[in-house]
Amino acid sequence: MAAAAGVSGAASLSPLLSVLLGLLLLFAPHGGSGLHTKGALPLDTVTFYKVIPKSKFVLVKFDTQYPYGEKQDEFKRLAENSASSEELLVAEVGISDYGDKLNMELSEKYKLDKESYPVFYLFRDGDLENPVLYNGAVKVGAIQRWLKGQGVYLGMPGCLPAYDALAGEFIKASSIEARQAILKQGQDGLLSVKETEKKWASQYLKIMGKILDQGEDFPASEMARIGKLIENKMSDSKKEELQKSLNILTAFRKKEAEKEEL
């Protein structure tokens, strides 16, 4: 009788255990597969529609239910680094086309192809219908530079907030005289820049001068040139220097140009 009762009790508990195990799998760290990534908010078909409309910028990664590998490692770093931005929320949606078909509604809404996972969309000002697709390499630096080009402020290595703002004003200025005045403002500001930051502040000024001499296409062509250089074998310190130069150049790219590339 006791044995029978034990079997009966175990049988009655099994549905509950199944639910608990499912929840544990869903929110387990990536080592055991699941959707919990430090710095990223996991969303589903319910929370997605609650979170996006209330946020200025949300970068959402749509991926398999249990992602892993190099691209996922890059995403983990990106999510952790997002703490530097007060206006950006990083989120992820896990999708499964079998079993319970987890979040397939969102996959269909945004016409996602599982062969292309991970897919990144930037949602702006709560707009659920017109997110911006990211088409670049799944690398932390590349995604950060793209986000910066979309108007998301990120405290990226090498970048100085005051000179980022000047770069934005410089690009928006419609006359040579106005741009020359902004360049002069930046030159005067060097006196108050920390010694450790003067090298990078000077880079902003150098780029402004190059744009005045060579035209609007300079930032894009210089980014392409440095991007190719980084692919070559070099010391970590040299690569870090070039990455900082790329980060600074991003401040001079127009949002319209970013949209056209997509």
Swiss-Prot record:
Keywords, sorted A to Z: Endoplasmic reticulum, Phosphoprotein, Signal
InterPro entries from the UniProt entry: ERp29 (IPR016855), ERp29_C (IPR011679), ERp29_C_sf (IPR036356), ERp29_N (IPR012883), Thioredoxin-like_sf (IPR036249)
Intracellular or extracellular location(s): Endoplasmic reticulum lumen; Melanosome
Biological process (GO), any one: negative regulation of protein secretion
Annotated GO MF terms: protein homodimerization activity; protein-folding chaperone binding
Keyword Phosphoprotein: yes
Chain positions found as Phosphotyrosine: Y66, Y68
Classification via SUPFAM superfamilies: ERP29 C domain-like, Thioredoxin-like
The organism's place on the tree of life at top rank: Eukaryota
Database matches in Gene3D superfamilies: Endoplasmic reticulum resident protein 29, C-terminal domain (1.20.1150.12), Glutaredoxin (3.40.30.10)
Cellular component aspect of the GO annotation: cell surface; endoplasmic reticulum; endoplasmic reticulum lumen; melanosome; smooth endoplasmic reticulum
Residues that span the membrane, as ranges: none
Signal peptide region: 1-34
Chain ranges for the short sequence motif Prevents secretion from ER as given in the UniProt record: 259-262
CDD domains: ERp29c, PDI_a_ERp29_N
Assembly and binders: Homodimer. Part of a large chaperone multiprotein complex comprising CABP1, DNAJB11, HSP90B1, HSPA5, HYOU, PDIA2, PDIA4, PPIB, SDF2L1, UGGT1 and very small amounts of ERP29, but not, or at very low levels, CALR nor CANX.
Chain's role: Does not seem to be a disulfide isomerase. Plays an important role in the processing of secretory proteins within the endoplasmic reticulum (ER), possibly by participating in the folding of proteins in the ER.
Protein name: Endoplasmic reticulum resident protein 29
Gene name as annotated: Erp29
